[in-house]
UniProtKB/Swiss-Prot annotation:
GO molecular function: chlorophyll binding; electron transporter, transferring electrons within the cyclic electron transport pathway of photosynthesis activity
Details of cofactor binding: Binds multiple chlorophylls. PSII binds additional chlorophylls, carotenoids and specific lipids.
Chloroplast is among the record's keywords: yes
Annotated membrane topology: Multi-pass membrane protein
Tree of life domain: Eukaryota
GO cellular component: chloroplast thylakoid membrane; photosystem II
Source species of the chain: Chlorokybus atmophyticus (Soil alga)
Descriptive protein name: Photosystem II CP47 reaction center protein
Residues annotated as transmembrane: 21-36, 101-115, 140-156, 203-218, 237-252, 457-472
A Gene Ontology biological process term: photosynthetic electron transport in photosystem II
Keyword Translocase: no
Xref: Gene3D superfamilies: Photosystem II CP47 reaction center protein
Amino acid sequence: MGLPWFRVHTVVLNDPGRLISVHLMHTALVSGWAGSMAFYELAVFDPSDPVLNPMWRQGMFVLPFMTRLGITKSWGGWNISGESISDPGLWSYEGVAATHIVLSGLLFLASIWHWVYWDLELFRDPRTGKPALDLPKIFGIHLFLSGLLCFGFGAFHVTGLFGPGIWVSDPYGITGRVQPVAPAWGAEGFDPFNPGGIASHHIAAGILGILAGLFHLTVRPPFRLYKALRMGNIETVLSSSIAAVFWAAFVVAGTMWYGSAATPIELFGPTRYQWDLGFFQQEIEKRVQASLAGGASLSEAWSSIPEKLAFYDYIGNNPAKGGLFRAGPMNNGDGIAAGWLGHAVFKDKEGRELFVRRMPTFFETFPVLLLDKDGVVKADVPFRRAESKYSVEQVGVTVTFYGGELDGVTFKDPATVKKYARRAQLGEVFEFDRARLKSDGVFRSSPRGWFTFGHLCFALLFFFGHIWHGARTIFRDVFAGIDPDLDEQVEFGAYQKLGDPSTRKQAV
């Protein structure tokens, strides 16, 4: 047939059997990729330290999605909390991965069967004997089945009625675990950070899908609407399907980047806005002040801060710090976190507390500035020592650590003070192991960043695909050069311009 590569889908345009076949093969590839990718990630995943080396620091992509649906156990004898377990069963990382690969194989065989046995009686219109699909009825079937699945997920899986529930955590990503979720039917269900909205929206959307599916199965479209929306053309189905997919891709890119109940920070890492707004810094300060008000010392107050919370308050975990051309997990950048050194408190020689100005998200380098409680610069690390008035040496800055591994330790040596001032720019101070993975010190993005970037790119691509195929199906007659309202018989080949009597070809 000699079709160019971008026209090869033409072969399934009027071939329902092979149209089913290629869709089965596509689903087989998707399912096979998911299972294989899960096995690969499990092979390289280190579950030993869920606090300082969580899955999102290791660049895991499918494991967070499996975990948020309630899978927490592995055949390797561990669970997501780092504990040892026995008898994980089929509802485990490897069990679900294996079922996807088995499903992929079955779909592969089904695809081959439908490719070979493409000319089934089922696909022929009994009135004409030609291949035909009842697209409005197929639409009703798909809508009904997807509505049933949507309702089942919300009513049974998420609520724990028949299933584990989903991953639920607090706003600061400390107490996350899999638990049943009650549907939220009030206005609070529209809060994107309320897990109850996930249950109620799936139940509501599922019921709507079931009813709409039944409607389309029982009611035939009016002929004028059928013609106007090109309901008989398979390319109409393609166009509207692409529209649904690109819209979904745009939505999930937003919920991932800005955060939501469906994208918990324990599984995907923090959002960039939590760094920009000082979200974790403020919570830590609030907890410290509460401890001090309760009679605790500074050391006791900072020691009570969970290491997990302190680790979130570190710029290296900001997904916007990684570049799009820096491949690999976060651990390949700054290294594997080994421990929290503690909270660094800086003071000048007169005993006034100084605060290091934190680095904004979109800076690679930033001047080291130490400010007093009024925001006035009192010390810095100057670029030109000769013109310096506020150097660490001149101001006599010292640093004392509270909490962490260096609890109670004070450094007065200017070189050491400057080292920790530079590191305090990046948030709480942590020690990293850069040798194990040969980490290069250049920040990487988290799976949150990669998911957002990938889905935005595909959404844009699919948006243009929707416009392209929509235009092709709506203006098919125009592109073909045939006017649908043409009354007279057109003799093909009689005119230089199709259907234009003024351009009749002259006999040679």
